[in-house]
Amino acid sequence: MKRNLALGVDIGGTNSVFGLCDEHGTLYFEESVYTREYPTPEELVDKIYERIKSVGHLPNVKGIGIGAPNGNYFSGTIEFAPNLKWKGIIPLARLFEYKFKVKTILTNDANAAAIGEMIYGAGRDLKDFVTITLGTGLGSGVISSGNLIYGHDGFAGEYGHVRVVPNGRLCGCGRKGCLETYVSATGVVRSIHELDSKHSETSELINLKNPEASQVFQLAEDGDKFAVEIIEYTAKVLGNSLADFTCFSSPKAYILFGGIAQSGPSFAKKVKGYMEDALLNIYKDKIEIRISELHDKNAAVLGASSLVWNELS
């Protein structure tokens, strides 16, 4: 194979996924490893190198893109990621460059998703949009005039830690009331136990030992009144917050990414409704809510690899 390829790497607290794709988003190889099996980042880099070498694609790799928690674009480091076994500041981009001898770009996973949408997905026709990643937590990547906003230190876009409820739910960051404690898979599950509802005692949710967000959405579709209230509340918190975010970002669209976003069009429609109700008049009816077009199974690798093509363009 003589086609130029980018190696995309998504570092997760549980699993890390890596794969090879071309500038059109065609995936040629993908594999997942258990992150915690590697006591040091050097050992993980060695593993990925040997796998890419073994499948015969090493000469085709023209660059490496990495999406990682607390990833800093400017320094190429992972900084104090709470969900990783490796502590402190990890110079991961430098480790990959030393091993592979190619340019390596690192940023956080939400920023990688935003670039992925711009290169391959729902943001291909947009120059100003915000990707909202809805997973265990909530992240965001802000694209303005076709460029990702990193801020002065590489950590712009921590939208999940905007406080939406004064003295609200305790967040993993140590603060209270952060958006991701309400709008995320974890936030949806917390609402089962924390929302005061006259319908809670008759809901099937109460009988679930370890409920998941996907079950809440499914029960809402089936008409469970308490589940409907939870989804409505989640959409309202997000919609109101997006209306505030619009005041200083003024995007053409918000692109919802992740499991919650893929739960069905009704959630996005609810978010849109609450956002419109809360928007200033100058922004009304101007902003779209779109669903990610990146295939959920390959989204992490595509997002990471897109960093390479964006840098080379």
Predicted features along the sequence, with ranges:
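A generic structural motif
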Residues: V33-Y34, K85, F155
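Glycine-rich phosphate-binding loop of actin/hexokinase-like ATP-binding domains
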Residues: L126-Y182
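Conserved A3 ("GATE") glycine/threonine-rich loop of ANL adenylate-forming enzymes
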Residues: T14-N15, A112, T136-G139
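ATP-binding/phosphotransfer module of carbohydrate and carboxylate kinases, centering on a glycine-rich
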Residues: M1-G63, Y73-T77, A93-V102, I119-L126, ...
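General beta-strand structural signal in soluble alpha/beta enzymes
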Residues: T104-N108
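Residue-level detector of high-confidence beta-strand sites
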Residues: E30-S32, A81, G151
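A charged helix-plus-loop insertion that forms the helical arch/lid used to bind
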Residues: T77-I89
